[in-house]
């Protein structure tokens, strides 16, 4: 880019100036030294560094091939116009283009070709040239200012440079001064057509400014180095010739605007001559009586020449101090010789009003500019004044007040009052003090004016206080002799005969001159001035004076008394503002100020200046004790106030009921008409101080009317008021913005929207956003860079970096406007309506004159680096929040502004903070400003060889700079400190995050890009306790995130080789372990400091967050990241665990808890990812238990999510390995903790459910248009919520506790079960809290395993909680949480209301199984309540084979199986239901057999019918098997809600269909086996029916019809013997298929190995067959023994049975010979009675009894 700017150029003088000020990137001592060593010659040459044109130089320019010819031409024209050397002109042009040119390089070509544009450019270069010249002088001034200042960091470097300059500096600068005032003004003949009158005037201003600066340098030089007498003579003659600035060669051109410069030349001329006379050392020699040692005492000839020269002076004021000084010098050194000359010279000086002149001089110098020059001038004048007062009689020096004024100006230098109090009171300024004391308190003002000037530091303030506290004389004036005094003979002494009360109206505080007091009398203008010898404290006297004013306030004397009181108040203000501790002693005065304010504001024409002084005093007091000042002030009615408290913002903004107070009426009636605003300035400072002192406290609400007054009455209109003095308008604007800035800066975002009554910040935000106050702020921001530059250029003194001129005030105001606007936008509550402020900020104006363009152009400002920085910050804010295109707003200037941004960004000496802000702005723009970021990326596109587009970086691409900033290979990277490096990395991160592919593409191709980018990750950081630069952590965090984004988005194989190498290096150099250890040490450090001393919390959070993402990516892309070592993984996990533990144990620190919560997430993820590799579970459980305890002690609202994470981690750990109670540390305490948490959570859920129920019913009555503004609390029933996870954790812990003792103790200590069941009941009734309900049932199910647990659950009232409420689950309309039909196991396990019903059924089954008769009544109640659903479910299997339906049938049959053990009791209580269940079980058996028999039909069913929910619920079968009916009612009965898609799955392959089929088959088989087991309890026991003749057959119904045909699937045939035989056949066939391994049905079982699956299936099939045979035999004998059955039917049955069973037996025998499994009957079910127990042995031979039994039965039948 430098090349683009027209070649490299030397360091400009302005850059050198910036470096010396310490505002550049070069801030190290050695860098400053190097710069001074390099450029000291230029400083020595001064203005003569710039040479006049010469032919040889022109030739060299023409011959130079490195410079483009158009630039040469322009350079030569510039050379002629400025009268500057051609080579230097070209160099100047190049520097200008680099630093100040406001166009693009492309536009430069057109500018050079266009005559008018190139003329305008030449004029701008002239301005630049003038500033360059000035900057050389500024540099020298700066060196002279600080080279002896011990406090300055570069003092030694400056001193070395001044040593080099010392010898020749003054000589050269004096010559330059002479040249300047003798130079002829340029004309158009000599300098070309461009030299118009205006340009000549501009030149002359520059000439005068340079003269004044040269003289200032010479003056400062002579303050440090002695002037030879000969030099004084030369200078005197030179200044005389030049008329002390007034006799310029071009004086005919000097206009009124140039007078300040001419005056300055005169002032410095006079000061240089006075300084040259060395009056200070003369004073010392005179005191020591060694006058001959003074240099002028030794050089009589020069003294005579000087005398002659001095006698010719005296016609202009500038001569006065020179004449006075010379008269003193001659009078001291040779009083006899020169008495007449001295008298004449001295008289002339007095006639010229020397002291008035000196006062003017000092005020002019103090009004802005270099403090050092001002204080040096003060020292110079102090010496002169002290010596004059010591040497001459005071009355000979003219008007005493003038001397006092000069003394006060002199004492403005802080060091001089200290000096004064250290000197003899009889010499120097002590003489004036003594003189004014002689008139005190008759004349108050002179003494107080002088003492006010004598207060500069705390020690001097105490001296002034003591001085006034111990007065020994009281002076008063009498026109006539009082009658109560005795006079001495000669009348010079009076003695009081009676005591005198000095203030008759003074009240309690008073002064009394006692009887007998003596007073000296002086007659003065026919009046007696009496000096009473009376000791008193002036402070008491002042109190009396104020008291007097309060008494006369409504009389005509008020003005006179105000003149006496104002100096008192001013002195008090100065004393307490210097040393606030004295305020306590001055309480009698300060406490009366409030009353004074109250009284004075009501006077007809109020004394505005006194009121302003009073307010200033209160401002100082408010800094110390705002609450007291505010309370006392409120009673005075001075400040604006409201009659009634304001409750809302609308009232506030409208200023409803507001009273402007005493101040408001003063402003309207006195200040605005007069154009003087002392009270307004004081008022604004007071309110700002009060705001800073008590914002956030309750009293800040009382300040609302004051702030409202400022926002409504002052800010919108202050610029339209009438003003007498220049600069007051700007000051008021600045103070108003300072007030708003203080309010917005001190407020917390949390406070902003929390309070109900509007606060000060929200008032400011609302006013600025929605009223005309905001428009004023916008107009301030819109002043623009050109206006500011103009004001700065017009200042007589723009040299001081800390100057207080108009320009600096304007810059400060604009900066405040930026900051205020930025804060208003940041803090404004979100709204759908665009506020007028935002509208004005973002609207597009014609010709780029909108505010965005104005803001962007502040980049051209050079005086104060904070101004462009704040402008860019505001742009950044607007680019983030406002819906507009910055690029469009910039219009045609966009590219030029881009160039300016990049020029400053790439400059090696630019202030680092501006660079950071530019990069932050671009970082935001990546996401929000696509057009703008394309402009800055400046990517050039060309077509690649293979037809794809190739991108490359344009010349003006910001990526050049960014790549340079991250280049770790470069040496001496002073220009890239950590903050800037971080900003560059953040910009790259934004590109990656926003997926700017073209930019990423280019960056990836850059050599060593990944190496440079990641180099910080390979460094070693200092420990957290010593980290001085936290931005390094943020840098590393962003780099980690970039790597993660790259790995995540780029296909594994396509990663750059360079990145792969870097990742490999990261792993091989053990950086995982390093960073893991560092993050852990951060956590430990945070925990140790309890998060309190941590200033870099944000960076810590960023690093932890990035490390978390990196580890997550590394865990999922282990091969890419080379994180495959199990030991490393284990170590990383343990580090995370330790770090989390350290943080979460600091329950008192919110910061620690937040960071701990972040690490807890990582802990959980790693635990799940690496659970097989983490080794001993016990090592993890210990820290986890501690973490849980820490979390439970912390703020529960804050820890809600963290608690859930810890619970989740516990669940994961407990599932990793089967544990016993002894394996878990503090198991019982852990259980108690979990249950206590659960107790609270469940109660909260209960309350929330009830509340939502109440609010839902209330909401129905509300108008539908009403919206609820308050955010709803997070619902407790979350799948990952604490409550649900707590229940799951409790379940896991319960499973560990085999005998249930620990749980029994907990249930005794805590009412957890009743609470749980109550909430469960409400949830079921309302069909709400699905996740909770499911988790609670799982826990209860686990508890019910053990006898104790089951007893506890039953005892807590489980039936009442579940039985009736469960009806709601399938009777209420589904609220969208229904289950979609699916054949996948995963979706079946997802929480659903049908799942809740199934779980309830399982719970009942388990409780009945565990408690048996103790739970029977409840079980019968349950089956009675849910009988319809039970029967529907049994019937539905035939129609719907969805997993949900099969699962429910399985659970239902399981419950019936348990209940069937209690046949008699069931029959007694619910005979009809029992019969219906028996019938339906038979039909279910038939349906299962049919579906298992015909696989193709089942597959067809699955494909076509199961997409729908149950279209028709099959009604339960009637009692008699023969009459069966079906109705097609449309109630949604079972598992799936209607309306789900019935399309065939498109993407499912055959394999997945097969899997689904096998899952359904397995489900049907389970249902079938349980159905048969249950039916077995409803049929007579085989042994009993065969052997017991007395068996009551009526107890047992027929379960199967006497039919042997295999039933077809569609026909509604009653279940028969054919059904049972078919079932045996199906089971046998399936066994055969299993042996042949034809089908992979074993996978559906869900066991880990195929062998286990096969074993399970075989057992199940054998169990089914055994039960079939058992039922067959039992039912056959039941038929045979029943007399009601016709013998013919019995005979037919015997025949059919024997033939069918014989066939089956032969098949069975064949199967057993091959080897068959054992029956699981003994394990799964209560053993069948009698012989059947012998059927379930393990060895194949033992299977023969089954065959024997069947054979025996066949023989029995055949008889």
From Swiss-Prot:
Subcellular location(s) per record: Nucleus, Nuclear pore complex
InterPro entries in alphabetical order: ARM-type_fold, Nucleoporin_Nup188_N, Nup188, Nup188_N-subdom_III
Residues with N-acetylalanine modification: 2
Keyword Signal annotated: no
Residue ranges, compositional bias (Low complexity): 1523-1532
Polar residues bias locations: 1539-1549, 1730-1742
Main localisation: nucleus
GO terms under biological process: mRNA transport; nucleocytoplasmic transport; protein import into nucleus
Signal peptide: none
Bias (Basic and acidic residues): 1259-1277
Top-rank lineage group of the source organism: Eukaryota
Region span, Disordered: 1255-1277, 1508-1552, 1718-1743
Phosphoserine sites (modified residues): 1719, 1727
Alphabetical keyword list: Acetylation, mRNA transport, Nuclear pore complex, Nucleus, Phosphoprotein, Protein transport, Translocation, Transport
MF annotations from Gene Ontology: structural constituent of nuclear pore
Pfam entry (one): Nup188_SH3-like
GO terms under cellular component: nuclear envelope; nuclear pore
Subunit structure: Part of the nuclear pore complex (NPC).
Family indicated by similarity: Belongs to the Nup188 family.
PANTHER family xref list: NUCLEOPORIN NUP188, NUCLEOPORIN NUP188 HOMOLOG
Chain's role: Component of the nuclear pore complex (NPC), a complex required for the trafficking across the nuclear envelope. Required for proper protein transport into the nucleus.
Name used for this protein in its record: Nucleoporin NUP188
Name of the encoding gene: Nup188
């Amino acid at each position: 880019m430098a090349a683009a700017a027209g070649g490299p150029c030397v360091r400009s003088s302005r850059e050198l100036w910036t470096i010396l000020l310490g505002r550049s990137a070069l801030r190290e001592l050695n860098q400053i030294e190097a710069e001074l060593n390099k450029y000291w010659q230029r400083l020595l040459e001064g203005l003569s560094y710039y040479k006049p044109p010469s032919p040889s130089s022109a030739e060299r320019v023409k011959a130079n091939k490195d410079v483009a010819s158009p630039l040469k031409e322009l350079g030569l024209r510039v050379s002629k116009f400025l009268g500057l050397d051609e080579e230097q002109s070209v160099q100047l042009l190049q520097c200008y283009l680099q630093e100040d040119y406001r166009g693009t390089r492309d536009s430069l070509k057109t500018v050079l070709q266009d005559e008018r544009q190139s003329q305008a450019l030449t004029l701008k270069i002239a301005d630049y040239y003038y500033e360059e010249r000035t900057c050389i002088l500024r540099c020298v001034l700066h060196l002279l200012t600080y080279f002896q200042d011990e406090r300055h960091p570069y003092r030694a470097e400056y001193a070395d440079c001044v040593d080099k300059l010392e010898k020749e500096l003054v000589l050269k600068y004096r010559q330059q001064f002479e040249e300047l005032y003798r130079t002829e003004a340029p004309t158009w003949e000599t300098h070309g057509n461009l030299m118009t009158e205006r340009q000549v005037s501009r030149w002359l201003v520059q000439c005068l400014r340079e003269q004044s600066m040269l003289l200032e340098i010479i003056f400062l030089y002579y303050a440090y180095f002695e002037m030879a007498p000969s030099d004084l003579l030369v200078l005197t003659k030179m200044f005389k010739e030049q008329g002390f600035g007034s006799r310029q060669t071009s004086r005919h051109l000097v206009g009124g605007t140039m007078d300040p410069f001419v005056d300055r030349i005169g002032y410095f001329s006079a000061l240089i001559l006075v300084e040259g006379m060395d009056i200070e050392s003369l004073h010392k020699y005179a005191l020591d009586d060694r006058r001959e040692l003074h240099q002028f005492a030794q050089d009589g000839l020069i003294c005579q020449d000087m005398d002659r020269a001095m006698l010719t002076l005296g016609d202009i004021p500038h001569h006065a101090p020179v004449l006075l000084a010379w008269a003193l010098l001659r009078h001291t050194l040779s009083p006899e010789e020169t008495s007449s000359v001295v008298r004449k010279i001295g008289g002339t000086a007095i006639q010229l009003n020397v002291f008035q002149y000196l006062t003017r001089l000092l005020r002019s110098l103090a009004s802005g500019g270099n403090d050092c020059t001002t204080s040096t001038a003060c020292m110079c004048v102090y010496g002169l004044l002290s010596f004059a007062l010591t040497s001459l009689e005071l009355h000979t020096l003219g008007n005493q007040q003038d001397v006092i004024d000069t003394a006060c100006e002199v004492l403005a230098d802080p060091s001089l009052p200290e000096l004064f109090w250290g000197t003899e009171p009889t010499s120097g300024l002590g003489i004036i003090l003594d003189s004014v004391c002689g008139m005190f308190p008759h004349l108050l003002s002179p003494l107080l004016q002088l003492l006010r000037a004598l207060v500069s530091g705390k020690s001097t303030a105490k001296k002034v206080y003591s001085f006034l506290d111990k007065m020994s004389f009281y002076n008063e004036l009498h026109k006539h002799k009082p009658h109560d005094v005795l006079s001495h003979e000669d009348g010079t002494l009076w003695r009081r005969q009676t005591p005198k009360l000095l203030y008759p109206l003074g009240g309690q505080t008073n002064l009394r001159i006692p009887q007998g007091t003596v007073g000296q009398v002086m007659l003065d203008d026919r009046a007696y001035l009496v000096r009473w010898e009376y000791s008193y404290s002036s402070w008491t006297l002042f109190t009396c004076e104020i008291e007097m004013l309060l008494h006369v306030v409504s009389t005509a004397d008020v003005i006179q008394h105000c003149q006496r009181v104002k100096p008192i108040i001013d002195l008090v203000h100065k004393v307490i503002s210097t040393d606030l501790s004295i305020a306590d002693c001055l309480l009698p005065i300060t406490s009366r100020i409030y009353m004074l304010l109250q009284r004075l504001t009501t006077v007809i024409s109020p004394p505005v200046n006194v009121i302003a002084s009073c307010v200033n005093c209160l401002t100082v007091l408010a800094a110390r004790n705002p609450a007291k000042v505010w309370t006392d002030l409120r009673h005075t009615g001075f400040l604006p106030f409201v009659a009634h408290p304001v409750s809302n913002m609308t009232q506030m903004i409208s200023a409803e009921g507001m009273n402007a107070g005493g101040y408001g009426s003063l402003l309207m009636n006195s200040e605005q008409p007069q154009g003087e605003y002392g009270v307004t300035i004081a008022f604004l400072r007071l309110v700002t101080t009060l705001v800073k002192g008590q914002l956030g406290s309750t009293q800040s609400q009382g300040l609302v009317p004051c702030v409202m007054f400022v926002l409504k009455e002052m800010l919108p209109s202050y610029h339209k008021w009438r003003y007498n003095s220049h600069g007051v308008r700007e000051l008021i604007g600045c103070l108003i913005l300072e007030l708003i800035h203080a309010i917005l800066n001190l407020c917390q975002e949390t406070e902003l929207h929390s309070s109900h009554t509007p606060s000060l910040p929200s008032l400011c935000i609302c006013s600025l956003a929605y009223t005309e106050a905001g428009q004023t702020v916008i107009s301030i921001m819109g002043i623009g860079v050109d206006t500011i530059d103009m004001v700065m250029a017009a200042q007589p003194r723009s040299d001081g970096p800390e100057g207080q001129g108009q320009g600096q005030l304007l810059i400060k105001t604009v900066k405040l406007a930026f900051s205020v606007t930025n804060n208003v936008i940041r803090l404004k509550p979100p709204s759908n309506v665009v506020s007028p402020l935002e509208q004005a900020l973002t609207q597009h104006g014609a010709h780029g004159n909108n505010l965005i363009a104005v803001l962007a152009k502040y980049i051209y400002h050079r005086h104060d680096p904070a101004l462009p920085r704040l402008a860019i910050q505001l742009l950044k804010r607007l680019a983030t929040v406002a819906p507009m295109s910055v690029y469009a707003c910039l219009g045609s200037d966009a590219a030029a502004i881009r160039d300016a941004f990049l020029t400053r960004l790439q400059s090696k000496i630019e202030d680092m903070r501006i660079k950071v802000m530019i990069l932050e702005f671009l970082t935001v723009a990546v996401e929000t400003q696509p057009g703008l970021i394309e402009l800055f990326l400046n990517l050039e596109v060309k077509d690649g060889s293979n037809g794809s587009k190739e991108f490359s970086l344009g010349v003006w691409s910001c990526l050049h700079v960014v790549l340079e900033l991250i280049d770790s290979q470069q040496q001496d990277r002073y220009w890239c400190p950590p903050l800037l490096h971080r900003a560059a990395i953040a910009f790259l991160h934004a590109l990656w995050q926003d997926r700017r592919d073209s930019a990423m593409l280019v960056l990836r191709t850059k050599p060593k890009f990944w190496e440079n980018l990641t180099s910080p990750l390979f460094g070693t950081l200092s420990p957290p306790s010593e980290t001085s630069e936290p931005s390094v952590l943020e840098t590393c965090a962003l780099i980690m995130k970039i790597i993660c984004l790259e790995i995540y988005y780029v296909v594994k194989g396509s990663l750059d080789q360079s990145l792969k190498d870097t990742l490999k290096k990261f792993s091989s150099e053990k950086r995982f372990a390093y960073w893991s250890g560092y993050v852990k040490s951060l956590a430990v450090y945070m925990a140790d400091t309890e998060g309190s001393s941590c200033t870099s919390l944000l960076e810590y959070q960023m690093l932890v967050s990035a490390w978390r993402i990196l580890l997550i990516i590394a865990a999922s892309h282990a091969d890419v990241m080379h994180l495959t070592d199990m030991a490393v993984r284990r170590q990383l996990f343990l580090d995370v665990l330790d770090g989390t533990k350290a943080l979460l144990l600091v329950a008192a620190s919110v910061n620690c808890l937040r960071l701990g919560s972040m690490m807890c997430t990582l802990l959980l993820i790693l635990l799940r990812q690496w659970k097989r590799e983490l080794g001993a579970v016990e090592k993890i459980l210990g820290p986890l238990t501690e973490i849980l305890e820490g979390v439970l002690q912390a703020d529960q609202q804050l820890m809600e999510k963290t608690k859930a994470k810890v619970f989740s981690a516990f669940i994961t750990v407990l599932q990793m390995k089967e544990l016993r109670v002894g394996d878990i540390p503090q198991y019982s305490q852990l259980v108690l903790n979990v249950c206590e948490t659960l107790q609270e959570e469940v109660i909260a859920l209960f309350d929330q459910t009830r509340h939502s129920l109440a609010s839902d019913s209330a909401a129905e009555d509300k108008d539908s248009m009403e919206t609820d503004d308050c955010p709803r609390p997070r619902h407790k029933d979350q799948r990952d919520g604490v409550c649900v996870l707590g229940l799951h954790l409790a379940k896991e812990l319960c499973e560990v506790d085999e005998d249930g003792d620990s749980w029994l103790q907990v249930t005794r200590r805590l009412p957890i079960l009743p609470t749980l069941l109550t909430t469960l009941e409400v949830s079921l009734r309302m069909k709400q809290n699905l996740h909770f309900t499911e988790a609670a049932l799982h826990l209860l199910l686990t508890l019910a395993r053990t006898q104790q647990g089951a007893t506890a659950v039953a005892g807590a009232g489980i039936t009442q909680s579940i039985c009736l409420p469960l009806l709601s689950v399938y009777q209420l309309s589904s609220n969208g949480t229904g289950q979609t039909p699916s054949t996948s196991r995963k979706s079946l396990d997802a929480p659903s209301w049908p799942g809740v019903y199934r779980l309830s059924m399982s719970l009942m089954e388990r409780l009945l199984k565990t408690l048996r008769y103790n739970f029977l009544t409840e079980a019968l109640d349950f089956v009675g309540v849910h009988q319809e659903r039970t029967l529907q479910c049994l019937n539905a299997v035939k129609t719907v084979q969805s997993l949900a339906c099969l699962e429910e049938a399985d659970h239902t049959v399981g419950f019936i199986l348990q209940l069937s053990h209690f046949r008699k009791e069931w029959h007694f209580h619910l005979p009809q239901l029992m019969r219906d269940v028996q019938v339906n079980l038979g039909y279910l058996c038939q349906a299962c057999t049919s579906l298992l028999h015909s696989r193709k039909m089942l597959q067809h069913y699955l494909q076509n019918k199961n997409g729908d929910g149950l279209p028709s619920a099959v009604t339960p079968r009637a009692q008699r098997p023969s009459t069966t009916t079906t109705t097609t009612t449309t109630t949604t009965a079972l598992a799936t809600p209607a309306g789900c898609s019935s399309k065939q799955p498109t993407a499912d392959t055959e394999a997945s269909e097969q899997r689904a089929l096998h899952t359904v088959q397995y489900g049907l088989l389970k249902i079938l086996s349980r159905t048969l087991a249950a039916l077995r309890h409803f049929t007579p026991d085989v042994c009993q029916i065969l052997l017991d003749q007395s068996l009551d057959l009526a107890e047992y119904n027929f379960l199967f019809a006497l039919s042997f045909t295999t039933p077809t699937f569609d026909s509604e045939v009653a279940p028969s013997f054919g059904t049972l035989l078919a079932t045996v056949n199906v089971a046998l066939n399936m066994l055969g298929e299993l042996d042949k391994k034809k089908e992979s049905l074993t996978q559906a079982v869900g066991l880990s190995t195929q062998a286990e699956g096969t074993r399970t299936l075989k057992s199940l099939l054998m169990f089914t067959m055994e039960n079939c045979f058992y039922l067959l035999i039992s039912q056959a004998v039941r038929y045979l023994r029943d007399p009601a059955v016709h013998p013919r039917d019995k005979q037919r049955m015997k025949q059919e049975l024997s033939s069918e069973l014989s066939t089956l037996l032969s098949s069975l025998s064949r199967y057993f010979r091959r080897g068959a499994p054992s029956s699981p009957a003994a394990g799964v079910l209560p053993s069948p009675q009698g012989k059947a127990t012998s059927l379930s042995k393990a060895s194949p031979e033992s299977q023969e009894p089954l065959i024997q039994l069947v054979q025996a039965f066949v023989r029995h039948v055949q008889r």
